[in-house]
Curated annotation (Swiss-Prot):
CDD domains: PBP2_Lpqw. Keywords: Peptide transport, Periplasm, Protein transport, Transport. Changing F496D: More than 50% loss of glutathione or bradykinin binding activity. InterPro entries: Peptide/Ni-bd, SBP_5, SBP_5_dom. Part of the ABC transporter complex OppABCD involved in the uptake of oligopeptides. Peptide-binding protein that shows broad specificity but a moderate preference for hydrophobic oligopeptides and those that are 6-16 amino acids long. Can bind the tripeptide glutathione (GSH) and the nonapeptide bradykinin. Glutathione (GSH) uptake by mycobacteria through the OppABCD system contributes to the depletion of the GSH pool in infected macrophages, which impairs the ability of the macrophage to detoxify methylglyoxal (MG) and contributes to enhanced production of inflammatory cytokines. This is Oligopeptide-binding protein OppA. PANTHER family: MONOACYL PHOSPHATIDYLINOSITOL TETRAMANNOSIDE-BINDING PROTEIN LPQW-RELATED, PERIPLASMIC BINDING COMPONENT OF ABC TRANSPORTER.
């Protein structure tokens, strides 16, 4: 099954021609959503990264991570003892758009860039290592224990020094309020994900206000991820009511509790500044500040070159070549749980509401050629991602994609059988032309995916209409409201892959933007999340994935190679892989 689609892929000559036509200058990971609600004992693997530049000359980049490294094996962050770094400094990063909502639990705040920024300011329960291992973050909790299994009970004991930036102590009420808000019990809360909260029976006070006892109504396999990885804890003041939850952070974040706080917002200059939190009780951060500038995708690499920002993702060979030849810039790489895909819209009334049509069209999209073109020179063996739950390299990953393996002749037969007959270049049925709208963020590299799909679908008589949009309102105005037939964007996962099952793939999932589902998928998700044995849970998750493929839910395309161009003097920052960043340790090396 794993090889079937590869054997049916485009011939090398076709891939080479497409690659030459579509070689872009922007990274394909600009528009991303968080996949659920990851990691830190980093390693730097010194290897030689070789590739061919656009001119065919050999390019050597060293040191950097091995292009063949798997998820869960490495981070590449220039690890240094924080005590040896400069005291002070400003880390300059970029955002695609000014956040529409700073509440990362809200559907409009569930954006990878926003959440990455807020991680420096909010509590999390565990520190995640490069191998996905979890260690209690003692800045916030002195212990987190699974104290019972029948019923499942988790006890959080909060660090007595932990306080919000407004001076309010962090207590069990913050945990209780957030779990209630995102549980789905009150539909007025516009949540991005329930993240296991829907399985909680109660949250009660423990021995004192600094202890929360969480009792589950149903077992939850990924309980460690409720406030870790991509998950964070917000103050009760921001989650107590739907009004506070939905609108309390539209103009800026609420109280925080990290080593940094958001201290300045300038919508005119499109700038956000984080500075040291004066109430922070943990290790003193090396940096004075972190500044985020809103830049469109094409402006990021030039901004790195002219010393306006200090790091940016690299998504094409052209970008890699330019960045590697820029004085003072290093290339750091560690594959992470980030992946790009096509979400299909099967909502009632949409052209793809018919599952049989979705599957036929899926068989007409050559995912192997997409991978080979989009990741040419970035990985040693570009292949598509073939699982919705696990990324390649994670325990549990297997290829379940055979049901939609690229087979244009089969796709043509199925379209004929469905009554979509050729009329000239494209197909029609009952006087309606088979036109599919493809929504994507307007960058050259994201356009690669769209153009290759457009080319291969045209061969089977399907017209793909490309709809490029800017970063502003991409999710809130289009994806979230289902204004697409196919939507291209990325998911950013963490060390808790099962956490995303309900959020994305359940019939009523908060991030099921295509409104596709089935009772069988819902039941399989429930069986998976209720299984506390990790090996059995992974096997059950693959049964879920098989059902997702068979439903024509979405098409995973490529997993990010995790390549980042970083100022060479910047330490403890870069390509993290699965690992968490330690924001107190990031800094610049002494000259």
């Amino acid at each position: 099954m794993a090889d079937r689609g590869q054997r049916r892929g485009c011939a090398p000559g076709i891939a080479s021609a497409l690659r030459a036509s579509f070689q872009g200058k922007s990274r394909p990971w600009t528009q991303t959503r968080y996949w659920a609600f990851a990691l830190l004992t980093p390693l730097v693997v010194a290897m030689v990264l070789t590739g061919c530049s656009a001119s065919g000359t050999q390019l050597e980049l060293a040191p950097t991570a091995d292009r063949r490294a798997a998820v869960g094996t490495t981070s590449d962050i220039n690890q240094q003892d924080p005590a040896t770094l400069q005291d002070g400094g400003n880390l300059r990063l970029s955002l695609t758009d000014f956040p529409p909502n700073f509440n990362i639990l809200h559907i409009d705040g569930n954006n990878a860039e926003v959440a990455a920024m807020m991680k420096a300011t909010l509590p999390r329960a565990f520190i995640i290592g490069p191998d996905g291992s979890t260690t209690v973050d003692t800045n916030y909790f002195t212990s987190i224990e699974l104290t019972r299994t029948a019923p499942q009970v988790v006890t959080y004991t909060i660090n007595p020094e932990a306080v919000w930036s407004d001076g309010t102590p962090i207590t069990w009420r913050d945990i209780a309020s957030q779990i209630h808000a995102i549980s789905g019990a009150d539909k007025a809360f516009e949540i991005a994900s329930s993240s296991g909260a829907e399985r909680v029976a109660s949250v009660t006070r423990g021995v004192d206000d600094r202890q929360a006892v969480v009792t589950f109504a149903k077992p939850y396999a990924e309980w460690r991820g409720m406030f870790a990885g991509n998950g964070m804890l917000l103050p009760a003041s921001m989650t107590a009511t739907p009004e506070a939850f939905n609108k309390g952070q539209l103009d800026g974040p609420g109280p925080s509790a990290g080593p940094f706080v958001v201290s300045a917002l300038d919508r005119t200059a499109q700038r956000i500044v984080l500075t040291r939190n004066p109430r922070w009780w943990g290790a003193r951060p090396r940096l004075d500040s972190i500044t985020y500038l809103v830049l469109d995708d094409a402006a990021r690499l030039p901004a790195l070159q002219n010393n306006t920002i200090d790091a940016t993702g690299v998504g094409t060979l052209d970008q890699l070549t330019i960045a590697a030849r820029t004085k003072g810039i290093s290339i750091r790489r560690a594959p992470g749980p980030s992946w790009y895909h096509f979400t299909l819209n099967g909502a009632p009334g949409s052209i793809l509401a018919d599952k049989a049509l979705r599957l036929a069209i899926a068989k007409g999209i050559d995912r192997y050629t997409i991978a080979r073109v989009a990741q040419y020179g970035l990985t040693s063996d570009p292949v598509p991602l073939n699982n919705h739950v696990f990324v390649a390299g994670q325990d549990g990953y297997q290829d379940n994609s055979g049901v939609v393996a690229y087979n244009p002749e089969q796709a043509k037969r199925e379209l004929d059988a469905l009554g979509w007959r050729r009329s000239g270049a494209f197909r029609e049925k009952d006087g309606r032309q088979l036109v599919i709208r493809d929504l994507f963020y307007d960058a050259q590299s994201t356009r690669q995916f769209a153009q290759i799909a457009q080319h291969t679908l045209a061969q089977i008589g399907v017209k793909l209409e490309l709809q490029a949009k800017s970063g502003s309102g991409f999710f809130s105005d289009y994806v979230n409201v289902g204004a697409f037939d196919i939507a291209q964007f990325g998911w950013v996962g963490d060390a808790f892959p099962l956490s995303s099952l309900t959020q994305i793939y359940a019939s009523d999932g908060e991030s099921n933007f295509g409104k596709i589902g089935s009772p069988q998928i819902d039941a399989a998700i429930e069986r998976t999340l209720a299984e506390l044995d990790p090996g059995k849970a992974r096997a059950l998750a693959n049964q879920v994935d098989e059902l997702i493929w068979a439903e024509g839910f979405s098409l995973p395309l490529t997993q990010s190679p995790g390549t980042v161009a970083v100022r060479s003097t910047l330490a403890n920052f870069g390509a993290t892989g699965l690992a968490d960043l330690d924001y107190t340790a990031i800094g610049f090396m002494r000259r």
